[in-house]
Structures are given as C-alpha cells and as structure tokens.
A protein has these predicted regions:
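Outer-membrane beta-barrel porins/channels
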Residues: 1-24, 69, 89-249
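Transmembrane beta-strand segments of Gram-negative outer membrane beta-barrel proteins
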Residues: 4-29, 47-64
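Short hydrophobic "helix-edge" motifs at membrane interfaces and signal-peptide entry regions
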Residues: 31-33, 139-140
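Outer-membrane beta-barrel translocator/receptor signature
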Residues: 32-111
C-alpha cells in the first residue's frame, strides 16, 4: 500500500522493478549477473544459473515518509509487497524465471477548504474539495535467457499487467443552496509488456569480469476500460449521471 499525493497522476507511483541485489546498489540492474541471485530486469541474466541451482526470492519494502505544506505536516508509514520469483536452468544453455511483482500503486486522501464569498445574510460560504484514490497495477511475468556464446547472452520477458485504479473528487459547500458533487473515474487495465535483454561479459582474469547489459521494451498503446460517474445533490435531491468508455490510450 502507499499514502502519497503524487500517486494522483498517471498510473500512480511506478514500482521499482529491481530485486534486493539491485536495490542494494542504488537500482543498477541491466549489467548484474549472478548465478545465485535473480535479476528480472534483464532476462539475459537467467543463463547465469547452473543446472544444480533452483532460486526462490521474495521481498517487501517498509517506507516512512513526511509531507509538509505550509504549517501542516503529515507522517505516513507504508509497507508493500515487492516481488515473488523463481529461477532455474531450463536447458544446457538456457535459463528461465517466472514471478509476480507490482507495476504501480495508488493511494492518497487529501482535502482543501477555501472561502468563496458571503451569501445574502452575510454568512461565509466555504468550499471543501476532497480528493481520494486507490488501487494499482500488478504484473505476472515469465522469461527465458539463451547463451549464444560463452560471453554473450540474450533473453526476453513477457508480462501480463492487470488491475484497477480509482480516483474521486468530492466538492461540498457550507450553505444549503449550492450544489455539492462527486466525480469518480475508474480505469481497468488488462494488457501485456514485452522486454528484450542482452548481456556481454568481458573477463579480465579469474577474479574480475566486466558485464555490459542492455534492455529494450516494446512500446504500444495501453488497452483497458474506463468508467465515469458524476452525481450532484441539493437539499436531499440527487441528480446522478453516468458514462462508460471502451478504450484508454
């Protein structure tokens, strides 16, 4: 889960696709190659595992964040599941990995109250806008790596991305003669992601090896469904309206 106003935009906070060994080195991943650690960021690294090794890895993140606006301070403690994956030798020159990891997370709740004007009897009218969002996208992946040469490997990951994201805005006024409203936007995503990886190893001696890595992700429009809901009310009377869509690009 998360609690950040920045997740209001786009698909939310994009998850770090790196595993523990990558996070420990500041997020580098494309060149990492280790027979005892999974590197799902570059599928070419899957060939590093030997025939007697089966890897299973899981991780989570704990976060402590402080937000400040003017004199208002807020502390948020979040925990999130990061990944679950396994890797094994598929063939003499081929390795494989499968796993599950988040793609993005959305979670926020904030409000703002402002003074608009005074009505006929001099009463101040306040407007309160409340913003909330939750949800996120998950991804399941499977990938293979193939050792073309002793020092050159290639690989590919295919991922299925799915999930729902909801954003809502509620506007309320302090007087009874003004319309209040709520607007809800929800998107549901079901799509794929395809990544290609390459790794080249240059061996200086028995102890020192320099690894080069590169990854290319196939770009395409995101497919999904959108749902919109709008409602206004005044003195107990509701005036709802809905609208549905088919494609999000």
């Amino acid at each position: 889960s998360t609690n950040s106003p920045y997740t209001r935009y786009g698909f939310g906070s994009l998850a770090d696709q790196g595993f523990g060994n990558s996070k420990a080195m500041g997020g580098i991943a494309y060149g990492l190659r280790n027979g005892y650690q999974i590197n799902a960021s570059n599928p070419a690294s899957y060939t590093a595992v030997d025939s007697l090794t089966f890897l299973f890895d899981a991780g989570m993140t704990l976060q402590n964040a402080n937000f400040k606006e003017g004199n208002i301070k807020t502390n948020a403690k979040n925990s999130s599941f990061d990944y679950l994956a396994m890797q094994f030798r598929l063939w003499k020159r081929m390795g494989m990995a499968v796993g599950f990891l988040p793609f993005s997370t959305v979670g926020y709740s904030l409000s703002n109250t402002s003074e608009l004007t005074k009505d006929e009897d001099g009463t101040v009218i306040n407007k309160t806008a409340s913003y909330a969002g939750d949800g996120g996208l998950q991804q399941v992946f499977a990938g293979v790596g193939f050792k073309v040469l002793d020092n050159l490997s290639i690989g590919a990951n295919i991922s299925y991305i799915y999930g729902d994201i909801t954003h809502s805005v509620t506007t309320a006024f302090s007087n009874s003669s003004s319309f209040s409203s709520v607007r809800l936007d929800k998107i549901s995503i079901n799509d794929y992601k395809l990544d290609f990886g390459l790794q080249y190893s240059y061996k200086f001696n028995k102890k020192h090896v320099l690894n080069f890595g590169a990854v290319y992700s196939l770009g395409h429009s995101v497919n999904g469904k959108g749902y919109k809901y709008n409602q206004k009310w005044l003195n107990g009377a509701d005036y709802p309206s809905t609208q549905t869509g088919d494609t999000i690009t």
